Amino acid sequence: VLSKLRFRWEHLPLVQDFDCGDEPWEREIANYLKSEAADGALTQSEERGNGAWLYFNEDRALVGYAVIGLTNWRWPDPKTKKQYPHAVAIGVDRRFSGQPPGPREGRYSWQIVTDLMAEVLKYPDVGSVLTLFVHESNARAIAFYRNLQFEFVPGLNYVDRTTASTYLAMAVKLP
């Protein structure tokens, strides 16, 4: 079972060796933790579920992190903008990918995302939906989120102007 810590500037040395992998989107997630997540953790209000968390295993090793904020999407009604909790970034260090062995519900990645879902439910004023974007060629992540009942949100995908990568919009309705 993972423990979590709200990310603060003093935790920056803990994340310097964080490594999600070699794919461009994996490097992007690791770099986000080392730069923008720290900035966001200090500048975003902690109200309404905003924040960044570090997740540690029983050996106190940094396993992963997650950042949640709010976003405005024209969904489900394309004529109306609505604010939703948004998983800005979720990362698991490559050393802990697929760990621990056993059922997927016990894996670190699963624990992190279900913890984010629980965070969202603490703030009913922002709704009971969690949104995110996933790289279009990251089939493993897409399957993972589909197993957690995330669905594709048509018309909200975006193309990163710097990398020309396409990211698919996904959302899950929480109980």
Task: Please tell me what each predicted stretch does.
Residues 1-103, 111-131, 135-175:
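Non-catalytic substrate-recognition and accessory regions of acyl/acetyltransferase enzymes
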